[in-house]
Amino acid sequence: KGVNGIETCRSGFNGAGGINTYKSTSDGYYSLAGGGATDIRLIGGNWDNLQSLLSRIIVAGGGGGGSGNSHDSIGHGGGTKGKDGISIANKYFAGGGSQFQGGLTFNSLYNGSFGVSGAGDGISGVGGGGGWYCGAGSFYAEFGGGGSGYILTKDSYKPANYSPSSKYYFSDINSVVGGNTTKQDGYAKITLLQALPFLTISSYNST
């Protein structure tokens, strides 16, 4: 929450939409960047490197940012499509990302795209959530759109120049939107299904 009259600018983590220059007010308005995605990718580098984004095989979508005001729909992330962020009057909305495109809103400047969310701007502006395709941001949607999740399978959508091969395909998958059984957005939990063998560590001194 900004101090009255202070202009702030916040960037988002791993695809989340940041907040452009925003001037807080004595009314206590505040805006939040979107939540970042968590992903497993095969090629490293900067988070927004296109080649790296095109190597993602699992993505947990982040939730859209919130302005703290009333709303009809919270932009949870994850699942095959992120939830839309909708204001209480349904006058403004920020769409969630899907498997095929980023979230859309009334102004294309705030639309989400592949791996990059729409930014927020203005009073109560909000950023979209990071994801496979990211959510839209807005200057007054009260909640940004959530980013979509992704799991690579034989039948999953694969954009042009997508690099992982069939040896990385998953089966028997379940993609869940945040805010349901998980109660959270944009996180990954790794469970060890088989005990690792004991490791023998040897050391030596070179002369």
Where are these regions (language model features)?
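Short beta-strand-to-coil "C-cap" segments at the C-terminal boundary of structured domains/repeats
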Residues: 41-44, 152-154, 189-196
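Eukaryotic low-complexity intrinsically disordered regions
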Residues: 159-161
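Secretome/extracellular-domain signature
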Residues: 1-91
